[in-house]
Amino acid sequence: MLNIQHLTKAYGEKKAVDDLSLHIAPGEIYGFIGHNGAGKTTTLKSIVGILQFDSGEITIDGISIKADPLACKRKIAYIPDNPDLYEFMTGIQYLNFIADIFGVSANDRQRRIRKYADLFELTDDLAQSIAAYSHGMKQKRAIISAWIHEPRLVIMDEPFVGLDPKASHLLKGMMREKCDMGGAIFFSTHVLEVAEKLCDKVAIIKGGQLIRSGTMDEVKGDDSLEDVFLELEGE
């Protein structure tokens, strides 16, 4: 599904990501954790083609993001850490805009928008300007837009920030359903309890370098993920 080999990205003399390699297989929810500035967002933006990286290779279903970015982007969805996008649109205009980009048919988009807007209790707000949305409403809109074209791979940067408990529960269910159907999820989070309960695998990044990765048992053993993370951060 997603293969990252020796990814390196520098800003001037500082390496934001340094020789990072990971593989996310179909059916996996893969968590990506690290302190602020560790390189998580740079990695995610490199995967989805927003940032040009200096060296290494990223492939999605064997397709290089550098060689054929459009083919890769058709297979993925990306939820950034800041959902403040296209605020001049209404909610429904934005969702239709995303559906247009991915060539979703009128019937399919209508059905999917209705399904997810009802789930997230956003139906009555779709005609409103996005500028009037709360942070949580913008995050829900971003989630709906990510699922609208049924991507193979969903990349998310801190997706639970701003969500109420009900919406968080719904998102977790959608993530598991996506993977049960052969898709994959790769997401960053600071909520270690969520990562520990939800993820099949997890990677810990520090100073741009991968310091531990694997199944939850491989990463944490008999300890809590929080204890392991804090111990590694202190080294």
State what each model feature region is.
Residues G56-A67, A71-C72:
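Conserved ABC transporter NBD signature motif
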Residues S168-M181:
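Helical segment within the ABC ATPase nucleotide-binding domain
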Residues N96, D100, N107-D125:
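Conserved ABC ATPase "signature" region
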Residues V154-E158:
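Catalytic Walker B motif of ABC-type/P-loop ATPase nucleotide-binding domains
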Residues S213-G214:
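ABC ATPase "signature
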